[in-house]
């Protein structure tokens, strides 16, 4: 995964200008009034070629791939800092707000990489954030990489904060038995009436074993982790969520990123079900040499309905551009799902490409009144310029607000360069605060400042201009109906579909570290 800076800003309507600086952005939006705000920087890349020059080309002033989680008025985000060309970053950064995004405290996770406070590892990547209500502890899961013998993932670690996400302790080893772990994610059971209240679950795939799914469980606030368990399926990009009754549901892509499915545990992580296919994927390659794929973004409402969004071109004639589509669970175990529905950001004949969704669902809402927020990237027709947009729904996805442009006019060449293309992140994130606004976090960028450099490249490695920013929450306006969208698939699995989930021969062909 790459690093890029992030900024949080409230939504603007289409046509808004670029952010003042590249970065990671968080926004807060919902219907029906419009609000606009300016970007505020919440995190930086403190490194340079002199202080972090890994074995591969290293981008600086370049933070990428954010995740976030919220509890009450506290929002914690984590992201890569100093993205390295052939995998991972110099460090994992964090930004924490205790007042719904008004003020932020930022820093680097200690003792993870050799560039920060005595860490042992060469690189780190794939940060994911969770909160454990039983133990009142914040958790950030990270994948660490080593360079010797070729860059590869070697272990999953969990960093813990017991003071509301403001400072972080020495990371705890979660697992180091996989051949080459990738794409980790973390979640905790925060429902006091759940039989597994306080359980936390970390998911990843073992790229060195055909992208085999692995899960580990902690029952003590992330201090110790159990042995990995598996259902022997090939996956990538799983995002576990926990229902109020303690059932863990894990939406995921298959190892080849050609299908979206879900599996579950109803016994606190002791065993995991086979995968139910939600839908096959149709995907359009995004312009501009951008690193991007149809990985899922998943969340859950207050009653246990799971929502999963991904990039898909099935509704576009000739598959010439991508939409953001979604499906939601129709039963308590995630083994039945609604038809795939197009989110009506733009008309299906607009030619506008939409990709890398960051989905939020307000857990204080449920049923037909579930509130959904969606942050996403888009590129205008026949353009490689990147923009970031936001839309929301106050009725469980039946209708959606008019889209707002948060930032626009970013050249893909300003993004960090990696072996899999220019990168803003394999995923971005949105989280609802206690203000009932969806705070989205994403990477943004301006032109590098070194000499005549026009891209984040070998001539501008220390000046990629991608800091971490935030924005004051805003509110989206308007309403667009999705009721007449065509429906192509309503999957409930089946024996033929299970072939999609076979472990890939030899090493998995998809890895995103």
What is the meaning of each model-derived region?
Residues 33-513:
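C-terminal PAP-associated
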């Amino acid at each position: 995964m790459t690093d890029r800076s992030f900024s949080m800003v409230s939504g603007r309507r289409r046509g808004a200008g670029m952010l003042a600086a590249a970065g990671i952005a968080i926004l807060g939006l919902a219907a029906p009034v419009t609000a606009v705000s300016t970007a505020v920087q919440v995190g930086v890349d403190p490194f340079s070629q002199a202080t972090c020059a890994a074995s591969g080309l290293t981008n600086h002033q370049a933070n990428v791939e954010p995740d976030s989680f919220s509890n009450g008025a506290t929002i914690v985000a984590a992201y890569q800092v100093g993205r390295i060309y052939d995998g991972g970053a110099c460090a994992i950064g964090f930004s924490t707000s205790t007042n719904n995004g008004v003020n932020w405290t930022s820093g680097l996770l200690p003792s993870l990489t050799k560039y920060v406070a005595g860490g042992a590892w060469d690189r780190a990547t794939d940060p994911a954030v969770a909160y454990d209500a039983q133990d009142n502890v914040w958790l950030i899961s990270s994948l660490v990489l080593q360079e010797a013998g070729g860059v590869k993932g070697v272990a999953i670690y969990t960093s813990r904060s017991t003071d509301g996400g403001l400072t972080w302790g020495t990371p705890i080893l979660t697992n180091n038995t996989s051949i080459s772990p990738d794409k980790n994610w973390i979640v905790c059971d925060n429902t006091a009436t759940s039989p597994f209240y306080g359980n936390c679950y970390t998911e990843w795939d073992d790229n060195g074993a055909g992208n085999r799914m692995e899960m580990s469980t902690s029952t003590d606030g992330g201090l110790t982790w159990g042995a990995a368990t598996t259902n022997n399926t090939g996956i990538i990009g799983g995002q576990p969520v926990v229902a109020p009754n303690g059932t863990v549901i894990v939406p995921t892509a298959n190892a080849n990123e050609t299908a979206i499915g879900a599996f579950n545990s109803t016994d606190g992580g002791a065993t995991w079900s086979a995968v139910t296919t939600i839908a096959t994927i149709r995907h359009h390659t995004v312009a501009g040499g951008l690193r991007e794929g149809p990985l899922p973004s998943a969340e859950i409402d207050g009653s246990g309905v799971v929502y999963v969004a991904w990039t898909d071109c099935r509704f576009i004639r000739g598959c010439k551009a991508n939409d953001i589509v979604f499906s939601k669970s129709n039963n308590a175990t995630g083994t039945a799902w609604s038809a795939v529905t197009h989110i009506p950001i733009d008309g299906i004949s607009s030619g506008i490409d939409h990709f890398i969704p960051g989905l939020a669902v307000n857990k204080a809402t449920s049923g037909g009144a579930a509130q959904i927020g969606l942050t996403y990237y888009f590129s205008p027709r026949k353009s490689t310029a990147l923009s970031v947009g936001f839309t929301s729904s106050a009725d469980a996805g039946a209708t959606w607000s008019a889209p707002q442009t948060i930032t626009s006019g970013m050249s893909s060449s300003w993004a960090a360069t990696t072996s899999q293309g220019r990168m803003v992140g394999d995923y971005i994130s949105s989280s609802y605060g206690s203000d009932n606004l969806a705070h989205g976090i994403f990477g943004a960028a301006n032109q590098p400042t070194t000499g005549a450099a026009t891209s984040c490249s070998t001539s501008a490695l220390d000046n990629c201009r991608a800091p971490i920013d935030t924005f004051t929450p805003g509110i989206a306006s308007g309403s667009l109906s999705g009721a007449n969208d065509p429906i192509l698939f309503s999957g409930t699995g089946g024996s033929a579909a299970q072939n999609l989930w076979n472990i890939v021969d030899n090493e998995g062909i998809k890895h995103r570290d």
